[in-house]
Amino acid sequence: MDIKNSPSNLNSPVSYNCSQSVLPLEPGPIYIPSSYVESCHEYSAMTFYSPAVVNYSISSNSEVGPGRQATSPNVLWPTPGHLSPLAIHCQPSLLYAEPQKSPWCDTRSLEHTLPVNRETLKRKASGSSCASPVTSPSSKRDAHFCAVCSDYASGYHYGVWSCEGCKAFFKRSIQGHNDYICPATNQCTIDKNRRKSCQACRLRKCYEVGMVKCGSRRERCGYRIVRKQRNSEGHLHCLSRAKKNGDHTTRVKELLLSTLSPEQLVLTLLEAEPPHVLVSRPSTPFTEASMMMSLTKLADKELVHMISWAKKIPGFMELSLYDQVRLLESCWLEVLMVGLMWRSIDHPGKLIFAPDLVLDRDEGKCVEGILEIFDMLLATTSRFRELKLQHKEYLCVKAMILLNSSMYPSAAAQEAESSRKLTHLLNAVTDALVWVIARSGISSQQQSVRLANLLMLLSHVRHASNKGTEHLLNMKCKNVVPVYDLLLEMLNAHTLRGNKSLVTGSERSRMEESESKEGSQKPQAQ
């Protein structure tokens, strides 16, 4: 059959050589070649056209060589209810051919798929009209996606297929400033739309997918020719190197706690201090809703900085994720309140919530129940003022509040190692506080008295924190102020902990009652 006599508007996806004028054809369904087919899903065939539809016949005696494709392709179409699209990939070109098990390859790139539609088929057919997909390097590049953000890949950079944005980001990170800190839990989603939201998680994912510095000059090292299969030692070397780089990124500038002197630990705590947070002061006179809205917005902003501050404490990131979350959920309001006391220590009768939000005691009368909390904050601040609290002492005290905030038992046996690290870290911060007090020049007896006075004030901070949490929960239940984001998560965690303690307390009381009944019945039986 002559191709010139076929209908002009027919876009056949069949690959053929432009120099040939006759293309042998055979009837029957075919499938678009794909390097990835999900084995766990079934696909039904949907015919787009057939010889009967386009009104031409096929010679029965035409010879078709092996590997030829048919003229009536049936497209693999997902069955109803299946949401995963079919992957359409061109065959790899000889020029850019890669070993199937190359250490540079990443299996995650197979997860990226193209949706099947008529436009895709037309583009595929038009692209193969004059060149075979087997020998077209451009068709291979079109079928690859960035292993980091899932955007279209511009090439093979630093050992993986990546886009220009992730390539430039990784280049900047390995050449310059890369001590990024995740404001959340190091589990941010990195995709095309959110790749710029968290630099720390983006760099972590770069290392996870296999980006390495040694792969930056791949095109200049003869990789354009077909490479031989690497041996197993080469595989292990590349994988171990990528893993080491990933561990180095997740622990940026991490110092071994055992080698830190008290002075170095204090300096690290000083560098970890969060910045001042600004919040717009509501218009006067204050109302219950306006004041609570300002305080909750401020608390939510400070919580983000508090998490970053905790991650910068040497040894905190070595704890298990369970212990990290548990400590932050238990002490978040204590940490915020002791920071409020430090800002207010030079302003008697004032509470410096923020540089642009300064309140006195009388302004708290507009909110029901908050006046008692203001009095507790002012009294504890006055006691710190009498002791002439120093800035380095404040840094150590705040870190001790975080590390000593939770006394709940470990959830599993594997948490024992994390608990041991937590105890070691708390002892190191306590030694730093003792060192700071010793440098003040007072006698040994006065040093012991001062240390005891500072530690006794922590119970007052905890009491004020409990009152504040209870008041905030009441305001939330009364719908006085909406609570969102991190602040809502902290309150929910406090509520869940309270429910668990109530359950355990009721169970304990029932056990005591049953034991008392058994004890009273035994003498009667005798």
UniProtKB/Swiss-Prot annotation:
Residues 507-520 have a biased composition (Basic and acidic residues). Phosphorylation at Ser-84 and Ser-102 recruits NCOA1. The modification Phosphoserine is found at S84, S102. It holds the Pfam family zf-C4. InterPro entries: ER-beta-like_N (IPR021064), ER-beta/gamma (IPR028355), Est_rcpt/est-rel_rcp (IPR024178), NHR-like_dom_sf (IPR035500), Nucl_hrmn_rcpt_lig-bd (IPR000536), Nuclear_hormone_rcpt_NR3 (IPR050200), Nuclear_hrmn_rcpt (IPR001723), Znf_hrmn_rcpt (IPR001628). Residues 261-494 form the NR LBD domain. Residues 502-526 are annotated as: Disordered. Nuclear hormone receptor. Binds estrogens with an affinity similar to that of ESR1/ER-alpha, and activates expression of reporter genes containing estrogen response elements (ERE) in an estrogen-dependent manner. PANTHER family: KNIRPS-RELATED PROTEIN-RELATED. Belongs to the nuclear hormone receptor family. NR3 subfamily. This is Estrogen receptor beta. It comes from Sus scrofa. The gene is ESR2.
